[in-house]
Amino acid sequence: MSEQEALKCSSARNRGGTQRVEGKLRASVEKGDYYEAHQMYRTLFFRYISQAKHTDARELMYNGAQLFFSYNQLNSAADLSMLVLESLEKSEAKVEDEDLEHLAKLFSLMDPNSPERVAFVSRALKWSTGGSGKLGAPKLHQLLAVTLWKEQNYSESRYHFLHSSDGEGCAQMLVEYSAQRGFRSEVDMFVAQAVLQFLCLKNKNSASVVFSTYTQKHPSIEKDPPFVQPLLNFIWFLLLAVDGGKLTVFTVLCEQYQPSLKRDPMYNEYLDRIGQLFFGVPPKQSSSYGGLLGNLLNSLMGSGEDEEGEEAQEHGSPIELD
């Protein structure tokens, strides 16, 4: 027998052994021997880990967690879910979409109000930074956002959409959020905040997609500009200005639409950061003019009218995105 054939036989035996073990554990759960089954899962997990069988350990815990969830054994299920994460951490496994989908599935099965869920998602996002994204893998954020949207936890869903790359999904959630929880007079503010925050995260593409999708799908908004709401016209012009990178255009926009921008005190904070990122505005400093406009006017007088976005400051004080 060749070495390759021997490896195949060994792998088949391992799968067969794992399946037999899972069958026995499932039978214990079905009989109601939850505590005994839970302890057996834990024993097998640490045995597999000590043998560096990380994939086997992870698959066993993932299937076991789902089984316990199906029998409403939430504490045991949450514990095995944490062991799934532990196996990923100890194996230093590469971040794969399948693993992210499994983590999101376990998250969706947990009690939304449980402290275990909070601990699980925090740890999962931290592990996922091994792939892409300082605040967690965008794919995981997107999956979490969809689950929270289904639970009508719109504010938490919006946070995770912001750290994903799914502008379209974010817009559709915001349309529902606006319809379910907002006033008719605030339909423009839901999308304005999202666009400004996406731009603060240097995600121009998602900012554009969320705006176009939201305005197309919201029943209380015209499908195309110009819009009745001045704030929507400002956001539309801002997205065009970001592509052009002209400081003069940005300054005039902020000046002309000040009445609309005063509706939320955070807008000028976001715009100050956007000015730094895309229009070469230096970080906020004390000014005789005061505020955002003063900073913009100082920038114009100090750098000329043809300041380009490519020379924008990459570093500045971060803005807390809720």
UniProtKB/Swiss-Prot annotation:
Disulfide links within the chain: none
Sequence segments annotated as region (Disordered): 303-322
UniProt keywords, alphabetically: Cytoplasm, Transport
GO cellular component, one term: cytosol
Pfam families, sorted: GET4
Gene3D superfamilies, sorted: Tetratricopeptide repeat domain
Localization per Swiss-Prot or TrEMBL: Cytoplasm, Cytosol
Biological role: As part of a cytosolic protein quality control complex, the bag6/bat3 complex, maintains misfolded and hydrophobic patches-containing proteins in a soluble state and participates in their proper delivery to the endoplasmic reticulum or alternatively can promote their sorting to the proteasome where they undergo degradation. The bag6/bat3 complex is involved in the post-translational delivery of tail-anchored/type II transmembrane proteins to the endoplasmic reticulum membrane.
Assembly notes: Component of the bag6/bat3 complex.
Family: Belongs to the GET4 family.
Protein name: Golgi to ER traffic protein 4 homolog
Species this protein is from: Salmo salar (Atlantic salmon)
